[in-house]
């Protein structure tokens, strides 16, 4: 009998505290962007905070739909991965790893970046990342090998200063 009363009392207290926690205001939004050798500013904290406000206009902890918010942040083309979580103090934490371009590709008159995984993503209106320009009709299957070549050029001080781009013409690559 004592065990039953204890379990019921514990359940009541737990449900009361959970309701109180869900109705509490979100204290803070902490955004952690990945740090790299060359800073990346495709997405900034203001963009993410605006997105959080859209997903939680009431600012109540219980109204935050963390999986949906995380999915929406991951849909941003400049974001490689995002992790959204709430701690017990009512702070929403957002960890973001931005895509880092290996090269900028000009293909059929359109410009876009390609990251180390071979993923294409658009040019930003807010930020231009310093990377090698590649021109020509480059197939997506060639991105990995081309990325490795660009990385080798970037690591060599002489090559980095001497070559400013790569151009593909008639299935041949020419260093510019």
Model-assigned labels for residue ranges:
Residues 1-75, 80-176:
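Charged, solvent-exposed interaction patches on well-folded alpha/beta domains
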């Amino acid at each position: 009998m004592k065990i039953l009363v204890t379990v019921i009392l514990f359940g009541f207290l737990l449900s009361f505290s959970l309701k109180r926690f869900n109705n509490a205001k979100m204290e803070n939004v902490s955004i952690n962007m990945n740090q790299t050798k060359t800073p990346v500013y495709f997405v900034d904290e203001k963009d993410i905070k605006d997105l959080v406000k859209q997903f939680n206009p009431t600012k109540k902890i219980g109204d935050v739909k963390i999986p949906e918010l995380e999915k929406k942040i991951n849909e941003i083309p400049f974001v490689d991965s995002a992790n959204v979580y709430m701690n017990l103090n009512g702070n929403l934490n957002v960890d973001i790893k931005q895509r880092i371009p290996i090269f900028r590709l000009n293909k059929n008159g359109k410009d876009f970046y390609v990251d180390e995984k071979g993923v294409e993503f658009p040019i930003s209106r807010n930020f231009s990342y310093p990377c090698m320009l590649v021109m020509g009709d480059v197939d997506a299957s060639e991105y990995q090998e081309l990325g490795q070549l660009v990385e080798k050029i970037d690591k060599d001080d002489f090559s980095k200063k001497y070559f400013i781009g790569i151009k593909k013409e008639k299935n041949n690559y020419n260093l510019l």
